[in-house]
């Protein structure tokens, strides 16, 4: 039996769901194949979305017309804006979600997309002819043919789980691994390697002594992920904090010989910024304690996630260590922590569209590209889905630049630098952080999403209305003057220099000690101007305030970004045989030959390519 589609998406995780949704919504007849339709968009690790830089990615997905933002809002059981101690440019939203409701919301969303079919089966073999993808053969013997195929298989490709000395093949606990599929891809010259990740123990909340823990409440203000969706409506639940201690560390150290990470059982590299508890002990031997966060998995379950206690040690050692934490002295666990090794593919063999450089019509997204995190996966999935649909329609690839989005930074890092450990996004990876704020993803991307056919007309109209009100507030502040007697009492209270004469309101807004909230208390006209916005009043005010506070920084970053854009316009793909260019350094020749960057800007970001190497290429290009 053979099924025919425009786009085939393999894997129903966070990357696959966004890819399938994007492809179908932009006009491609799409099939999403997954091993278990009841575990679509499963949160395999922490039931949370967002965080530092990750929250910005989710807002970018939403601004383009993707699904993750509004689904997170609909299933959030605790919301917080991180980094509030820093300026608004560094703020990052994060939400704790109800795991089961998140899956149901995703399934409901996908079921309502007209051009999307979901099939429960397993990819067994990639079908390729003349370096062009044809589709796949499945475990049950059918063939699915497609003009474009997107691989979003997560940790399932030759997945191997570890708890102590026990090793079990699987892509997730109690779910089978996928064999043979990696090999069917690798035989076409695509490089495959191994990575490792892990997850903590899950605890029965009825066995926890919460009186021994510190409660951590969420925030109930106007912030959310979606620029267009409804606000979160589920009951908001607290998280709880505690810490390990010297006795816990002693028990864990005694068990290091049984840890797969230290007995030679696991050789793959795990995520640097989400280490296991045993790795923390080895890396920071002088630390007496490490913080732990007990987080609810939903409103209708007793299951709780112990953030900070990822481990692959034997079950009995994990449990004994937990019992020496006062709040967890009687803890009962649903399942222990475990590690998992899995296959990934070298992302430097991808174009910025996430299409393979070796097989036409084949796209990769998510953990199979060497990333870690739901948000990173979803962002890649969205781009891969858009480009798979564009490929079918013979349209230009959709590529986001580093000054346009964190998703653009992510994909550029993957395709030009590659990975030697699971890649996680941080604000520090972006050189244009002021341009990539969480408050302005709609300003950067909603128009693009609308023209792609992904963002709805209603969403686009709302953005145009919001933009009008942001500019109205900014114009009001630039045209309104403030006298010293109106404001100096406030300036003295907040510790900033008083006015000596009449000053424009926009100049006061730019001061770090001042904001719309405290200024509105002294200036009724500002309060009235803000209130004129018809809805999402506070969100609009926040965006206007951020643009005024960072005006100078925004202008400087834009000038620098425009200079770099000139290098982006100089295409070098196919122009050179790098191995023969002896004016370049040896390392440069090797890297350029292996990665084959498409533009001079991409070449400049490859580790080992120096400014002098770029100058040589510029001269050879006649620039």
Residue ranges: model-predicted function:
Residues 2-15:
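Beta1/beta-strand and adjacent pyrophosphate-binding region of the FAD-binding site
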Residues 3-5, 139-148:
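Core beta-strand elements of the Rossmann-like FAD/NAD(P) dinucleotide-binding domain
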Residues 10, 143-154:
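Short hydrophobic core segments
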Residues 21-125, 140, 152-172, 176, ...:
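Conserved N-terminal/central alpha/beta ligand/cofactor-binding core
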Residues 36-38, 54, 81, 183-319, ...:
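An anion/pyrophosphate-binding glycine-rich loop and adjacent beta-alpha core
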Residues 127-143:
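Conserved beta-strand-loop-beta-strand element in the redox core of flavoprotein oxidoreductases
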Residues 305-371, 399-412, 537-591, 596:
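A glycine-rich dinucleotide-binding beta-alpha-beta segment and adjacent secondary-structure elements
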Residues 429, 435, 446-615, 619-623:
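Extended, charge-enriched "interface" segments that sit outside catalytic cores
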